[in-house]
């Protein structure tokens, strides 16, 4: 016994669409619409927790405070120089990249701990705000502060 095939007709085009073709076209349309809904660009960076495993240029707490990266030129040039400086870092993966925001993950060599490092370009003040924080543990023994200072030196040297 043959099952009836569902055929849908477009009233103007008189084209037959099978059920599977209609589902595929709907899926493609969904993918394109999801791509258009991009993640909003952050306007600030999260605060550091009360643990000594984080540094941030936006922190008012001296234990967590670190200077932002200063730049001259355009925000686009600053992002290019920043990515060039990050190439010198080992075990770094870019997670999110937008025009004025960059989020990377840095892994430790031995235990593979993950640290989140975020950069937010402030074109009004020619600064790159930075936050580097360990995801786990209480203290990072200054690893995040040293990482940001290494990135700062590489950023200054990058052309």
Put a short name on every predicted segment:
Residues 29-37:
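Hydrophobic h-region of N-terminal signal peptides that target proteins for export
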Residues 14-27:
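Bacterial N-terminal signal peptides that target proteins for export
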Residues 36-159:
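Ser/Thr-rich, low-complexity intrinsically disordered terminal regions
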Residues 2-5, 15:
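Acidic, Ala/Val/Gly-enriched low-complexity intrinsically disordered segments
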Residues 5-6, 31:
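A composition/secondary-structure signal for short, hydrophobic, low-basic-content segments
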